[in-house]
Amino acid sequence: MTAENATLLEPVLGKDEIGWMFVQEYYTYLNKEPNRLHCFYTKKSTLIHGDEGESISLCHGQQEIHNKILDLDFQNCKVLISNVDSLASSNGGIVIQVLGEMSNKGKLSRKFAQTFFLAEQPNGYFVLNDIFRFLREDVEEEEESPDAVEKEKKDVASEPYVNGVQSQEHLPSAKEEGHYQDPAATENNFATAALISNETDSLNQATLAVPEEPVIQVTEASVPSFVSQQENQLQDEALTSNSKNADAIGASDANVATAPKSWADLIARNHPDVKSQASVSSTASTTGQTVKGVNADQTQQPTAPYTQSNELLETSVFVKNIPPETSDVSLKSAMSIFGPVKAIEFARRKGTAYVDFVNHECVQLALNKKTLQINNATLNIEERRRLFSGKFNKSGDKKSNDNYNGMKRNFRKGNRGAFDGRSKEVTTSKKQNN
């Protein structure tokens, strides 16, 4: 096979793949050989390096860029890349934008944005333009005012409840339109809390009258609601046949005390779209079965918002900038100053970990502290962000499910100082064909 035919068979790498290879090679030199980082530039290159909003001077030429890199004093600089975008530009050039976090000399990591323009040269590419900026991290989240929270508490506390269900005086007749929840759906705590809150809001907006027909009050275990007029013929028959039992139940409502506002009720107000689903046949059977066991169940069944609210609170935090020589035992011991530690998931290669405490109070103490000193290094403690479902992924997965969203891809090592835009597989293919 001639050299011309071999050249035609060589695959041409895309601009995005060349960009990936460059980014991997550039930050590898930044970590291991920062004194040779100027080899990526030429006398035509320009560089800007500073903080967001800072007025800085332009570095022109390879020598000025080299002096600037020496002034930055990179030592054991670690970079966590979260995003890389590459686009083809004019004259065969490539524009690359990098987002991530950088930690130098073991200090706290800072978010940054860096943009490269790779220009073509006979043997590959070189960095013609380089813009680097550290980003500010002073964005404040809006919090709900204490007055609004206190007002919501008073509104909910004024509603009469019996084991999480409104008393007979505040219940509409069985023929009013509403929603019904299947008893099997009580396993979903959010759905239960949202259902109670939605019914409360709708009742406050409507003018209610004492129903002429007996109204059957039931416990949280069966979670009743109201069926539309077109679907409740079977329920009307059950209500009529059990009127005596309902009268006895209604007499006991005089002694009902108001229930305090719960955390789950607050959550329910923020989820107005949560609705229950059930069939008409299950409505009839639930109503008939609930009448007989109301008095006994009222003293035995606790309300769902009280029994399940603590399970919804976060009990773990995300810790980064952990020195690789730190052991699991020493990390657990250091984090124990905030409270008992249940488990630790330590990604030693990334220098990050998830620390799971026994309760939410320990998490609050850790987040308020924000930093922790260990092995002459400052650990950064952040809130665990659950962007995807599932547990902490092992290293090597394509995506992470929580605080990780870095690029995890294998790169092929390029030439020092320039990139030829070709993979090693091309050389192997040529040898086999020859």
Swiss-Prot record:
Q: Which residues form the RRM domain?
A: 315-386
Q: Which domain of life is it from?
A: Eukaryota
List the keywords (alphabetical).
mRNA transport, Phosphoprotein, RNA-binding, Transport
Task: Point out the gene that encodes the protein.
Answer: nxt3
- Protein name, as recorded: Putative G3BP-like protein
* Function of the protein: Probable scaffold protein that may be involved in mRNA transport.
* Species of provenance: Schizosaccharomyces pombe (strain 972 / ATCC 24843)
Q: Which residues carry this modification: Phosphoserine?
A: S145
CDD domains annotated for this entry?
A: NTF2, RRM_SF
Coiled coil regions in record = none
Q: Where is the composition biased (Basic and acidic residues)?
A: 148-157, 419-428
Provide a Gene Ontology MF annotation, just one: mRNA binding
